[in-house]
UniProtKB/Swiss-Prot annotation:
Keyword match Disulfide bond: no
Catalytic activity field: 2 H2O2 = O2 + 2 H2O
Cofactor(s) this protein requires: heme
A GO biological process held by the record: hydrogen peroxide catabolic process
Subunit structure: Homotetramer.
GO CC annotation: cytosol; peroxisomal matrix; plasma membrane
Pfam families according to UniProt: Catalase (PF00199), Catalase-rel (PF06628)
Protein name per Swiss-Prot or TrEMBL: Catalase
The keyword NAD is annotated on this UniProt entry: no
EC number annotated for this UniProt entry: 1.11.1.6
Active site (record annotation): H65, N138
Length: 492
C-alpha cells in the first residue's frame, strides 16, 4: 500500500466515523464510562482526541486584515507590455494565470461587521509558471505613513484602547496629529469611499511602488491599479448601519452568492510607469506611499483582467490559512526603495511564520503550482514528501544547477548610514486637490465626519488646532469650515 496515495483529503472520506489515525469509531454519541452513570475513563482515546482537536481549532488572528473573504479565478493579459517586463505571466495577450484573491477589512477583529469605516485589503496571489507573485494592496492608492518604522505605532493607535478594548477617535487623532503625511489617506477614509458597498464594487491598488524590468535589463517604476467593471459603490452612514445591522457578513455573502449565481466579479488591471531617471522631475517623491501619481501626466495603461469564477472550498483552509507576502515576486517584477514596501518585505513573511508555522508555504493555497526545488528541510508541520539523500549544495551526486539569471535593477547605490525623512514631503498639496474634486454635498459629508471625530471630548484643544491647521494648509475653505463649526482658531 502506498502511504502517500491517500493524503488527507475529504475525497477519501469513509462512510463511517474514524479517529484521526483511521481507526473505526462505533459510537460518536457517548463517552466511555464505568457503567451507565459512572465516571468517564481516560482511556477513551476518541473522546480525548476529539476534545483536544477542538481546543486547538483556532490559530492566531492576523494582527491586521483579520476579517476577510477569499475567492479563486484567473488573470488574463489583454494588452502587450512585454517591452516593459520579462515577467512570464505577462508575456503576451491571452495568457491566463490562476489566482486566489482575499478581500478584507484592516483594523477590526475576525468577526467584526463589514460595514465599519476602515480601509479594505485587496490581495492577489498569481500562481505563475515562475513561482507565486503576491500583489498585496488596499482599496485606496495611498497609505497613512511613508516609513515602516511607524507602522506598529500606527496600528496600535488605530486598534482598540488596550485598557478598555474600544476603538477611540482621540487616540487616532492624537497619533496622526504628529504625522501630517496621513492627510491624503484621510481624504479617502473620511470620504464616502470609506465604507464600500461590498468587495465587488471597490477598486484595488498595489499602493507601493514596484519596479518592472524587461529582457534588456531596463527598469521602470510601476504602480498597479484594479478597476471594477461593475463600478464603485459605497454606503453612507445610515445605509451602513442598516446593512450591518441586518448581516455583519454582508460583503462576504455578496461575494459568495454572486459567484455561485454565475455573476463573476471582474476587475481591469492598469499600471502607471515612471522612468527612474525622471523621478526628480515631480514635486513629490514617486517612492512616497502617501502620494498618488497624477493620471493627467502619468496615464493609466491597460494590462489585463481579473475574473473570480470559483468560490473557495473551505473557509479555514483557503482564507484563514491563506498567506500573502509582498516579498514574493517573479522575474521581471522587483521591489523599489519605497520605505514602507521595504519593511513589508520582512514583516509579512514573519507574521505568517508566527501564525501558520515555518512551513506555511507548503499549505495548498500558499504553495506554488509550478515545480520547485530547494534544501529548506524539516521544521514544524513539514508535510512535504521527500526522498532525496542529498540535502546540501553543491553536490556531485545531485548536480542541481543555479537557475538562469534574470535581470534586476542596475543602479549602484552610495550613501552614509542615516535615519532621516525624505526631502519632498509636500504633505498638503494632493489632499487639497482631492478635496476640491468633491461635489459640494460630498464635501459637506467629509466636513461633518471630521467635525464629529474632532468633537470627541478627549480630543484636546491643541490637537483640534493642529488638525484645523493641517486642513487649512490643504484647503483654506475646508480649514475655515472646521474652525467655524468647532469654534477653534487654526494654529499655523
Amino acid at each position: 500500500m502506498d502511504p502517500y496515495k491517500y493524503r488527507s483529503s475529504s475525497a477519501f472520506n469513509t462512510p463511517f466515523w474514524t479517529t484521526n489515525s483511521g481507526a473505526p469509531v462505533w459510537n460518536n454519541n457517548s463517552s466511555l464510562t464505568v457503567g451507565t452513570r459512572g465516571p468517564i475513563l481516560l482511556e477513551d482515546y476518541h473522546l480525548v482526541e476529539k476534545l483536544a482537536n477542538f481546543d486547538r481549532e483556532r490559530i492566531p488572528e492576523r494582527v491586521v486584515h483579520a476579517r476577510g473573504a477569499s475567492a479563486k479565478g484567473f488573470f488574463e493579459v489583454t494588452h502587450d507590455i512585454s517591452h516593459l517586463t520579462c515577467a512570464d505571466f505577462l508575456r503576451a495577450p491571452g495568457v491566463q494565470t490562476p489566482v486566489i484573491v482575499r478581500f478584507s477589512t484592516v483594523i477590526h477583529e475576525r468577526g467584526s461587521p463589514e460595514t465599519l469605516r476602515d480601509p479594505r485589503g485587496f490581495a492577489v496571489k498569481f500562481y505563475t509558471r515562475e513561482g507565486n507573485f503576491d500583489l498585496v494592496g488596499n482599496n485606496f492608492p495611498v497609505f497613512f505613513v511613508r516609513d515602516g518604522m511607524k507602522f506598529p505605532d500606527m496600528v496600535h493607535a488605530l486598534k482598540p484602547n488596550p485598557k478598555s478594548h474600544i476603538q477611540e477617535n482621540w487616540r487616532i487623532l492624537d497619533f496622526f496629529s504628529h504625522h501630517p503625511e496621513s492627510l491624503h489617506m484621510f481624504t479617502f477614509l473620511f470620504d464616502d469611499l470609506g465604507v464600500p458597498q461590498d468587495y465587488r464594487h471597490m477598486e484595488g491598488s498595489g499602493v507601493n511602488t514596484y519596479t518592472l524590468i524587461n529582457k534588456a535589463g531596463k527598469a521602470q517604476y510601476v504602480k498597479f491599479h484594479w478597476k471594477p467593471t461593475c463600478g464603485v459603490k459605497c454606503l453612507l452612514e445610515d445605509e451602513a448601519i442598516k446593512v450591518g445591522g441586518a448581516n455583519h457578513s454582508h460583503a462576504t455573502k455578496d461575494l459568495y452568492d454572486s459567484i455561485s449565481a454565475g455573476n463573476y466579479p471582474e476587475w481591469k488591471l492598469f499600471i502607471q510607469i515612471i522612468e527612474p531617471d525622471h523621478e526628480d522631475k515631480f514635486d513629490f517623491d514617486p517612492l512616497d506611499v502617501t502620494k498618488t501619481w497624477p493620471e493627467d501626466i502619468i496615464p493609466l495603461m491597460p494590462v489585463g483582467r481579473l475574473v473570480l469564477n470559483k468560490n473557495i472550498d473551505n473557509f479555514f483552509a483557503e482564507n484563514e490559512q491563506l498567506a500573502f507576502c509582498p516579498a514574493l515576486i517573479v522575474p521581471g517584477v522587483y521591489y523599489s526603495d519605497d520605505k514602507l514596501l521595504q519593511t513589508r518585505i520582512f514583516s509579512y513573511a514573519d507574521t505568517q511564520r508566527h501564525r501558520l508555522g515555518p512551513n506555511y508555504l507548503q499549505l495548498p493555497p500558499n504553495a506554488p503550482k509550478c515545480a520547485h526545488h530547494n534544501n529548506h528541510h524539516e521544521g514544524l508541520m513539514n508535510f512535504m514528501h521527500r526522498d532525496e539523500e542529498v540535502n546540501y549544495f553543491p553536490s556531485r551526486f545531485d548536480p542541481v544547477r543555479h537557475a538562469e539569471r534574470h535581470p534586476i535593477p542596475p543602479p549602484v547605490l552610495t550613501g552614509k548610514r542615516d535615519r532621516c525623512m525624505i526631502e519632498k514631503e509636500n504633505n498638503f498639496k494632493q489632499p487639497g486637490e482631492r478635496y476640491r474634486t468633491f461635489a459640494p454635498d460630498r464635501q459637506e459629508r467629509f466636513v461633518c465626519r471630521w467635525v464629529d471625530a474632532l468633537s470627541d471630548p478627549r480630543v484636546t484643544h491643541e490637537i483640534r488646532s493642529i488638525w484645523i491647521s493641517y486642513w487649512t494648509q490643504a484647503d483654506k475653505s475646508l480649514g475655515q469650515k472646521l474652525a467655524s463649526r468647532l469654534n477653534v482658531r487654526p494654529t499655523m
